[in-house]
Structure formats: C-alpha cells, structure tokens
C-alpha cells in the first residue's frame, strides 16, 4: 500500500511539472540600418543577443534585422524605436539633431580628448542631463567615434582656405555649423548616400569618421584625407522602446542592464576606433 501511494505521489508530481506553464518567451526586434559585415554586428549586436538569451535562460531573445530590413533610411532609426516598429534600434542622434541638442554638444571641437573620454563623459551626465531627451525610449548604449576627417574626391585640403566654397557632407547641425565657419558649404545627408554623392560630384567631400572609409566603401571615391581637425566625433546610440523595457520581468530587466550601459558603450567605441585605423591603412594620400 505504501509503495502504491509513493508511486502515485511521484506520478502526480511529474504530471504537475509537465502541466506547469513554461516561462513566456519574449523576442525583441533589433533594427539595424547597417549590413551584417559592419564592424559592430557580430562583436556587439549579435553578442548582446547571445548574452541576453543566456542570462535570461532563453526567456528574452533579440532578433536582428540588418540592412534596414524593418525600414530603409537611417534617418528614421530613432522613430522606429519610438513607434515600436522595433523594440531596439541602432542609429545616430545627429540625424534628429533637434531631439538631442544636449547629447550632441559632445561633438563640438575641444569638448573631449578622444573617443573613450567622450563616451565616459556622456555616461557621466546621462542620468542628470541626457536621459530626458530620450522620449519614450531608453539608451542601452551611447558612444562616439574617433575625430572626424575630411575625405575629398579630387582636391587636397591643406589649409582652411582650401575649403572655401566646397560642398562637404555633414552628419548633424553641429557639424554643419563648423563647416560653415570653415568656409565650406555643408550638405546634410545620411551616411548611406555619401558614396553616390561623392562619386557623382554632388558633394566634393565628407566630414566623417575614418571607419566610414571601409563601412560605406568611401575609400573608393576618396583620393585625399585631411587629418588633425579639432576633436569632432560622431555620436551613435542603441535605444530601446520604454514600454518594451517595462514589460520585461524585473530579473530580465536586471540582466539587460548588466549587459548594456557604459561597458557596452566603451567596447563599441573602441571597436569603431580600431576599424577606423584599418580604414586609414588604405591607399589614400593623407
């Protein structure tokens, strides 16, 4: 009799385990406007997805949509997170300069001494001054590239006088203001349009980070590169829809917090810098 009762109890326990509902799986859509060969795709985007799945025991997963699969045009990246077309989005605050006036102060000449210093400064004032700019979103990462350089299609720039009247691509309003002060005519456009614009002469050059030489193949239309400009980095961010973040369980939010923030930002900034150095090793007159 005891054996029967014991066996019945074990059977009931096993059935209870089978009947228990499995933890709901959450899949976060990640909108990336760059291709999978981009320098941050595997070591940052994919690694975050892998690490988050591991930390949450598979309860939270990230599905990456690269090359603008959730909508073309990097200018709309921030709004894709706001409208929850994607739960997470990667982009540039400079494309929506009016939304991030304080964040973009980091791009002004003389504010920082390098990409690591700039990234640390952003996160030092994130809670007190910058988070209020992220309406309906939360910053998971925010970092800057090394100083911008002038990439020119057919004219070397040796002095500021050489820039007079030339059409130069700018990434943001702050960069455009600087180019105007230098005597150039700024033309704001997404990075994805620079290759064609330089190749066809729509612009004479571009003010961009060195990583763009390889990422956007600007090494092809670029004949001259001018370095040594005052520190003018490009700011990049990874943002998450605020409601999507709140829908995660407390322990899964903690897991995401652990994997993002300053640490992720510093690593991303350094990877961009390393890639920029590689781009400068091409056959271009400097």
Regions found by a protein language model. Name each.
Residues 25-116, 125, 132-286:
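N-terminal secretory/targeting leader peptides
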Residues 119:
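An amphipathic, aromatic/His-enriched active-site/gating alpha helix that lines ligand/cofactor pockets
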């Amino acid at each position: 009799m005891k054996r029967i009762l014991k066996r019945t109890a074990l059977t009931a326990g096993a059935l209870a385990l089978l009947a228990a509902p499995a933890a709901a799986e959450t899949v976060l859509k990640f909108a990336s406007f760059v291709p999978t060969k981009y320098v941050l795709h595997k070591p940052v985007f994919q690694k975050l997805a892998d690490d988050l799945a591991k930390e949450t025991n598979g309860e939270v997963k990230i599905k990456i949509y690269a090359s603008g699969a959730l909508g073309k045009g990097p200018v709309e990246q921030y709004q894709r997170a706001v409208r929850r077309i994607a739960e997470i989005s990667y982009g540039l605050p400079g494309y929506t300069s009016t939304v991030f006036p304080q964040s973009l102060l980091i791009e002004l000449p003389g504010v920082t001494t390098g990409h690591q210093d700039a990234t640390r400064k952003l996160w030092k004032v994130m809670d007190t001054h910058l988070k209020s700019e992220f309406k309906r979103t939360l910053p998971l990462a925010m970092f800057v590239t090394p100083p911008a350089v002038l990439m020119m299609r057919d004219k070397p720039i040796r002095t500021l006088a050489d820039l007079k009247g030339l059409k130069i691509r700018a990434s943001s309003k702050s960069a455009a203001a600087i180019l105007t002060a230098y005597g150039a005519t700024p033309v704001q456009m997404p990075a994805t349009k620079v290759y064609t614009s330089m190749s066809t002469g729509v612009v004479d050059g571009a003010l961009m980070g060195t990583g763009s030489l390889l990422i956007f193949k600007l090494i092809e239309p670029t004949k001259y590169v001018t370095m040594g400009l005052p520190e003018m980095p490009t700011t990049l961010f990874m943002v998450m829809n605020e409601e999507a973040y709140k829908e995660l369980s407390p322990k899964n939010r903690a897991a995401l917090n652990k994997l993002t923030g300053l640490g992720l930002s510093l690593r991303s900034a350094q990877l961009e810098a390393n890639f920029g150095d590689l781009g400068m090793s091409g056959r271009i007159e400097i």
